[in-house]
UniProtKB/Swiss-Prot annotation:
It comes from Francisella tularensis subsp. tularensis (strain SCHU S4 / Schu 4). Essential for recycling GMP and indirectly, cGMP. Residues 3-185 form the Guanylate kinase-like domain. One of its GO terms (cellular component) is cytosol. This is Guanylate kinase. NCBIfam families: guanyl_kin. InterPro entries: GK/Ca_channel_bsu, Guanylate_kin-like_dom, Guanylate_kinase, P-loop_NTPase. The lineage of its organism: Bacteria, Pseudomonadati, Pseudomonadota, Gammaproteobacteria, Thiotrichales. Gene3D superfamilies: Guanylate Kinase phosphate binding domain (3.30.63.10), P-loop containing nucleotide triphosphate hydrolases (3.40.50.300).
Length: 190
C-alpha cells in the first residue's frame, strides 16, 4: 500500500479537530488513517493527555530535537513551538497507515517540499470571520487577548488557503463531515 500524508489545516475554531475526530470514528477513517501526534511546548489544556493529543515537552527538549534535525516540520505559533517529528512519521508508516498531519500553512509548505505528490492537503474554512470569533468565544478557554491574537492569525492563515488541494467551508457540521469523508475516500483510491 502506498501511504499518503494528508495535511489538514485551519484557523483555530474552524472545526478541524471536530471533523477529524468524527472522521476517525468512521470505518474508512479508523481502518486506514492515523493522526500524527505533534510535539508542543504549550501547556496542556484541561483533559489533554501527553502522547494522546500532543507530546508535551519543554522548550529545551524541543530545541534539542530541533538541533538534531528531528522534525519534518515545525513552527512557532502563539508563542509556543509545534512540530511533527520524523520518528512519529516513521512509527505510523510502519503501521501501514495513511498519515494525517494537523498542521498550519507553514508546516504544510515544509511537508509538501519533502513529500511532493505523496502529500495531499485540505484547508478548512469558517463560514465567516464573525462566526469564527463566536466559536472561539464559545469555547471559553482563551482570554479576550488570545482570541484577538487568534483572529489576527486566522486572517494570515486563510490567505494561504489557495495553496491547498481542497477547500472546505465548515458551516453545517453534518454536510462538512460528509464532504470531508468523501475527500479522504476519493484520495485513498487514487
Amino acid at each position: 500500500m502506498n501511504n499518503y500524508i494528508f495535511i489538514v489545516s485551519a484557523p483555530s475554531g474552524a472545526g478541524k479537530s471536530s471533523l477529524l475526530k468524527a472522521f476517525l470514528a468512521t470505518d474508512i477513517g479508523k481502518d486506514n488513517y492515523a493522526v500524527a501526534i505533534s510535539h508542543t511546548t504549550r501547556e496542556p489544556r484541561v483533559g489533554e493527555i501527553n502522547s494522546r493529543e500532543y507530546y508535551f515537552v519543554t522548550v529545551a527538549e524541543f530545541e534539542q530535537l530541533l538541533s538534531q534535525d528531528g522534525f519534518i516540520e515545525y513552527a512557532k505559533v502563539f508563542k509556543n513551538y509545534y512540530g511533527t517529528s520524523k520518528a512519529e512519521l516513521d512509527r505510523l508508516l510502519a503501521l501501514g497507515k495513511n498519515i494525517i498531519l494537523e498542521i498550519d500553512w507553514q508546516g504544510a509548505q515544509q511537508t509538501r517540499a519533502i513529500y511532493g505528490d505523496r502529500a495531499k492537503s485540505i484547508f478548512i474554512l469558517p463560514p465567516s470571520l464573525d462566526e469564527l470569533r463566536k466559536r472561539l468565544e464559545k469555547r471559553n478557554t482563551d482570554s479576550k487577548e488570545t482570541i484577538d491574537y487568534r483572529m489576527e492569525q486566522a486572517q494570515s492563515e486563510i490567505s494561504h488557503a489557495d495553496e491547498y488541494d481542497y477547500l472546505l467551508v465548515n458551516d453545517d457540521f453534518s454536510q462538512s463531515l460528509e464532504q470531508f469523508c468523501k475527500y479522504f475516500e476519493q484520495n485513498i483510491q487514487s
